[in-house]
Swiss-Prot record:
Pfam families: DMRL_synthase. One of its GO terms (cellular component) is riboflavin synthase complex. The keyword Phosphoprotein does not apply. GO terms for biological process: riboflavin biosynthetic process. Pathway: Cofactor biosynthesis; riboflavin biosynthesis; riboflavin from 2-hydroxy-3-oxobutyl phosphate and 5-amino-6-(D-ribitylamino)uracil: step 1/2. The lineage of its organism: Archaea, Thermoproteota, Thermoprotei, Thermoproteales, Thermoproteaceae. It catalyses: (2S)-2-hydroxy-3-oxobutyl phosphate + 5-amino-6-(D-ribitylamino)uracil = 6,7-dimethyl-8-(1-D-ribityl)lumazine + phosphate + 2 H2O + H(+). It is an enzyme of class 2 (transferase). 5-amino-6-(D-ribitylamino)uracil binds at residues 11, 43-45, 67-69, 100. Catalyzes the formation of 6,7-dimethyl-8-ribityllumazine by condensation of 5-amino-6-(D-ribitylamino)uracil with 3,4-dihydroxy-2-butanone 4-phosphate. This is the penultimate step in the biosynthesis of riboflavin. This is 6,7-dimethyl-8-ribityllumazine synthase. NCBIfam families: lumazine-synth.
Amino acid sequence: MVRIAVVVSEFNYDVTQLMLQKALEHAKFLGAEVTYVVKVPGVYDIPTLLRDLVAKEEVDAVVTLGAVIQGATKHDEVVAHQAARKILDISVESGKPITLGIIGPGANRMQALERVEEYAKRAVEAAVKLARRKKTLREAKYAGSTVFID
């Protein structure tokens, strides 16, 4: 069974709480166990706790959830881009999948609410698939013919 952790932003709570609910439902549907749900103040804060989560033996992958709503400035772009960059860095460094379920930048509140289910489900599905494929790849042995991992 794949064990995932979820890190969810509290900012734009009306959106992110729905995302968390959909993510938990989808993880159960896929047969994954959610070992941790960690709340952080905002999307920009997500990378702060990722290293601690990926270091845990009972975490095979991490799902990040958040919503960066467009404002009058380009602040949403800075927040979303920097968080995404750091999330990917930590995933590559740790060797554990960390998926991006972050709505934005450039989304208004209505668009964010419309994307809740899609972003949450896709992030969970990607985490589960990557964790399973990573395990399969570790156990795979080349024996003269192409090894397909899907």
